[in-house]
Every structure is written in structure tokens, then in C-alpha cells.
């Protein structure tokens, strides 16, 4: 069954899921609640304390936790640690936890799995974000390549529209090309109803100081941006978030947790390296073990929990993306995103240490 826009009113409608035919509940019911557990025979409705927000000027109601289907894991498919069926189950688990924002991309190779996972679900209760890698600047018709990529994504995802279609990993030297040669095609796709909103994602590893996004946010072209932001590199707080909030551009937060923030020794190594390079003043740590300080002062059970809480409650961040192939990690990560902010003294300490750092990614 191909997922299409809902055309009915707010009353009941008949939908068929495999061999199970159910009477769907009025649309109003879904807002603020979880989705029907369609993959378990529709025998119950799970309600979780997910929080929702409005994604900038798009007006989309999105969960504050989003499932990232790329990253180092790619739902466990990158290193074949998980089967396709396990990846499908993971996506459905995320939805069962209240996540309605799913982010994938052409280059991740996970669009087919996302399509299979959401097949038969109410399409208008999901927000699907995918991306197109930039064609070569020497391409004779790069706009046509963008349109071709969109058609492929629609087919793989089993839908007739994408909520947010991004230009993927745009670097500073490629921004003018993206704006002048590719944006017209994106606008045409939006006018045709094949995409609802236009986004751009930065290449955080080659551009950790956000040069491309600083340039792009000077113009009113983008509905949504994807930004690298974490407690080791909070530079977007100064350079991007004031602009995104002023212009009401939706913000997706990637790189909340990477290798350096997944375990205490990784963070200790980063601090030692920064001290050695003089990036943070010697003595600024007061001889304290930073992971231990964070744990004691915040009550976080793990360093990733603290890192997710840091991002979730940053003014300007709408959706924090989390990616994994492990069901237990997914549950823990979503729970972390839903926990309270870090205490002010912890945030102040982190600002003192990392507030001027704009070249780390956390990898």
C-alpha cells in the first residue's frame, strides 16, 4: 500500500494493513499521542510521554527526538550488525516511543528500509526528511538530477510526497552552485506538491565553524537547516541560532553524541588534547575530572544522557537526531532527550571550557 496524503475529513476511514482491516480513530486523537501500533496487529495504542514542538515556520508538529537513519550506524545496516527486519523493527520501535520525525538520505541506503517500516501507517502522522547529494558542478543539467533523485526517493519510501527535502552536506565552496543551479529545481518540486519544505544540511566535519550555514541564513531561501551542535562545539549558539530563531528556520540537531561523547575516556582525551594545544587555558579544569563533574552535578546516568540533554534544551534546537542499530540504545537515547535540562552550574562550566571551540565535531 503506497502512503499518500490523507484526503478524508476528521471522521473515520477504512484502512487495510496486510490482513488486518481496522476502523481508524478520528484524526484529532493522534495529536500529542502515539501512533497506532500497526505492526503488532493494531491490538493496542501505546502512549508515551514524547514532547512535540513546531518546526519553525513550516508549522509541522514534530517530536523533539528524531530518528536518524544515517550516521555511523545506519540502523545497524552499515556494518551488517543488524538484518533488514531488525532495522524495520527499530524504526517501528521509535514510532512506538512517540517519534514522528524520520530522517534519511539517498546516500545512506536506508530509504528502502524506512519505506517498508512505514508502509500502511497514516502518512500524515509522520514527518519524512530525506536528502539529495549535490550533483557535480560540471553536470550539464544539475536541476534535472535533483528531480530524478527526488523521484527515486519517493519510490523507495513508498510515498507521493516528502515533507522536507534537503540539499545534503553542502560545503562553503559549493553554496553558490546550490543556490543558483539547484534551488530552482527544488522550488519547482515544491510547487508540484512533491516536497513540502526545502532544507539544507551542512558538512559538519569539513565545516565545523558553520561557514556555509552562516552564508545561507543571510537569505530567506531555506525552511529547515541541519546543524552540527554538541557540548564540545557549541559555536552554533553564537553564529547560527540567533539567525534561525529570528527567521523562524527549523533546526535539526545532528552530532549530539559521537565517539568522543559516548564514553568518559573519550571526553577526557578531548580535554587533555585541548589543554595541550592551549585551546582552553591550563588550570581551567581546576584539576577536576570533567565526566565525573558532569555526572555528580547533573545526575546523568551516562555521558550520552548528559550530551543529549545539553542539546535538547538549547534555545533554537527543534529536533535532536539520534541514530543507532540497538533497540536498547534507542530507548535510552529517547529517554535521555526527554529528561530535564542540565543544571545551570554544569552549563556554565561547559561554556567556560568549550564556549570558544569551533573546530571539533565529537568524532
Range-by-range predicted roles:
Residues 57-59, 115-123, 154-158, 188-190, ...:
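Acidic (Asp/Glu)-rich catalytic clusters
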Residues 80-93, 142-156, 206-216, 307:
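Short, acidic/polar
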Residues 43-126, 185:
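N-terminal binding-site loop/beta-alpha segment at the start of enzyme catalytic domains
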Amino acid at each position: 500500500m503506497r502512503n499518500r496524503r490523507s484526503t478524508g475529513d476528521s471522521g473515520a476511514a477504512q484502512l487495510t494493513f496486510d490482513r488486518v482491516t481496522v476502523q481508524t480513530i478520528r484524526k484529532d486523537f493522534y495529536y500529542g499521542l502515539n501512533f497506532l501500533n500497526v505492526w503488532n496487529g493494531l491490538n493496542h495504542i501505546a502512549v508515551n510521554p514524547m514532547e512535540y514542538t513546531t518546526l519553525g515556520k513550516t508549522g509541522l508538529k514534530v517530536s523533539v527526538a528524531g530518528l536518524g537513519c544515517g550516521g555511523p550506524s545506519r540502523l545497524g545496516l552499515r556494518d551488517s550488525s543488524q538484518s533488514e527486519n531488525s532495522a524495520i523493527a527499530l524504526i517501528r520501535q521509535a514510532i512506538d516511543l512517540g517519534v514522528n520525525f524520520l530522517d534519511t538520505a539517498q546516500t545512506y541506503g536506508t530509504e528502502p528500509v524506512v519505506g517498508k517500516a512505514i508502509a500502511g501507517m497514516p502518512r500524515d502522522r509522520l514527518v519524512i526528511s530525506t536528502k539529495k547529494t549535490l550533483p557535480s558542478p560540471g553536470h550539464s543539467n544539475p536541476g534535472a538530477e535533483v528531480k530524478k533523485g527526488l523521484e527515486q526517493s519517493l519510490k523507495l519510501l513508498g510515498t507521493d510526497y516528502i515533507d522536507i527535502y534537503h540539499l545534503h552536506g553542502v560545503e562553503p565552496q559549493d553554496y553558490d552552485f546550490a543556490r543558483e543551479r539547484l534551488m530552482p529545481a527544488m522550488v519547482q518540486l515544491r510547487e508540484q506538491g512533491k516536497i513540502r519544505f526545502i532544507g539544507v544540511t551542512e558538512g559538519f566535519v569539513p565545516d565545523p565553524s558553520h561557514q556555509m550555514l552562516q552564508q545561507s541564513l543571510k537569505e530567506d531561501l531555506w525552511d529547515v537547516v541541519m546543524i552540527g551542535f554538541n557540548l564540545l562545539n557549541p559555536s552554533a549558539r553564537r553564529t547560527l541560532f540567533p539567525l534561525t530563531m529570528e527567521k523562524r528556520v527549523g533546526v535539526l540537531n545532528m552530532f549530539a553524541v559521537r565517539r568522543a561523547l559516548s564514553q568518559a575516556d573519550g571526553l577526557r582525551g578531548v580535554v587533555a588534547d585541548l589543554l595541550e594545544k592551549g585551546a582552553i587555558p591550563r588550570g581551567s579544569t581546576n584539576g577536576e575530572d570533567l565526566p565525573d563533574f558532569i555526572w555528580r552535578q547533573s545526575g546523568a546516568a551516562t555521558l550520552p544522557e548528559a550530551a543529549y540533554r545539553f542539546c535538547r534544551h538549547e534555545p533554537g534546537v527543534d529536533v535532536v537526531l539520534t541514530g543507532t542499530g540497538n533497540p536498547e540504545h534507542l530507548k535510552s537515547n529517547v529517554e535521555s532527550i526527554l529528561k530535564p535540562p542540565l543544571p545551570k552550574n554544569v552549563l556554565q562550566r561547559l561554556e567556560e571550557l568549550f564556549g570558544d571551540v569551533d573546530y571539533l565535531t565529537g568524532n
